[in-house]
Amino acid sequence: MMNTDETIFALSTVFGKSGVAVIRISGNHALKALNHFHVNKDMKPRFATLVDLYDSSDQLIDNGIAIYFPAPNSFTGEDVIELQVHGGKAVIKIVLEELSRIFVMAKPGEFLLRAFLNGKFDLTQIEGIADLIDAETKMQAKQAIKQMSGELEKLYSSWRQRLIAVQSKIEAYIDFPEDVATEKNELEKINDEVQTLVQSIQEHLNDNRRGERLREGLHIVITGEPNVGKSTLFNFLARRDIAIVSEYVGTTRDILEAHIDIGGYPIILSDTAGIRESSDPVESEGISRAKKRSCEADLRIELFPFEQRYNINCNVISSNTIYVLSKADDVINDHDIKISDIDFLPVSILKGIGTEKLVSVIKEKVEEKFVYDRDVPVITRQRHRNCMQKAIEHLRRFNMNNPIELVSEDLRLAASELGVVTGIINVEEVLDDIFNNFCVGK
């Protein structure tokens, strides 16, 4: 664990040319930074003050803005100074060098760690901040902001408090066993409360991994035989030339990926090798990988050549597959073509036929994967899911017919798992894993 007694500093903005660079200082001695830069002004809390910054040789470095956030009403809960200087590399280097004479450079995530230790955020909120920083689409950002606002923490803490309340009643029966026989009605209420919690947590787990999918990206695979236009469609959806498009069979051998945004949802799009029998060991490996990726995908776009539409034979129909007639250069509209009870969408990338409709269908399919009550917080990380699963295992062992000490222990262990998610129960390796993934200035 990091030493939180030292005063730390770091650049909070990207190093390089910019209009403004922000340097954050946090700790008991943060105000000494202003003395070091020969700033003799009275700092009014949370007000921007224009300052001239001088180095150790009394040479002017820059004129900028300083803002003082006194503890505990700051981001970290400690005294914080934020310096805003011109975003040139030389200015930033000199300011950081001067600060290193009196303070310690912050480690990755150290500002947030201090905020967590000072009760400014719980772990789920900090993970929400990380997700907001990493968000590439509108829907990812919306989910991160909800988590950052503390919705998950409120849910998990309410469950934990209910378990603690039940456990306290059980503990009372341990201390006063003569009351157990006369309180059968109360014991039934306890059992009902635990079973209600089990149901609530199980419903929370039965979410089809929506939160994790939104955070990580939905996997869509383009599949089909060789030379049906998979790479052309891949490049079209990716809006750039990634895959090599060729008339030669077997050009695409390994899996190509592109991260795209469709309707605000993050998509990991994969182009795969054409499915066929091949004696070429390299192509065969590519085909094997293509089949595996197709099985693992959340959605598939399966291509069939338009000119062979009367010979199509689909043995398995899947609601997770969009069926496309590719290279449909001769069609006059994008109306679906029904073949063997399957609606095929004719698409011609060359003539722009069916492309808008295909994107619309993809968006509809993607949205179906994320249909849920927007007011209910969702699991966003495997860490949360693991703890919830462990908690529910302990609660399923709960049985009022067991020795009352074992009943109490099951409740304690379940409450502990809920506490691990929010950080009330301190697990050092979990903290290290979360905070080390942040940049230095966070």
UniProtKB/Swiss-Prot annotation:
Pfam families: MMR_HSR1, MnmE_helical, TrmE_N. Mg(2+) binds at residues 231, 252. Gene3D superfamilies: P-loop containing nucleotide triphosphate hydrolases, Probable tRNA modification gtpase trme, domain 1, tRNA modification GTPase MnmE domain 2. It is found in: Cytoplasm. It is an enzyme of class 3 (hydrolase). Exhibits a very high intrinsic GTPase hydrolysis rate. Involved in the addition of a carboxymethylaminomethyl (cmnm) group at the wobble position (U34) of certain tRNAs, forming tRNA-cmnm(5)s(2)U34. This is tRNA modification GTPase MnmE.
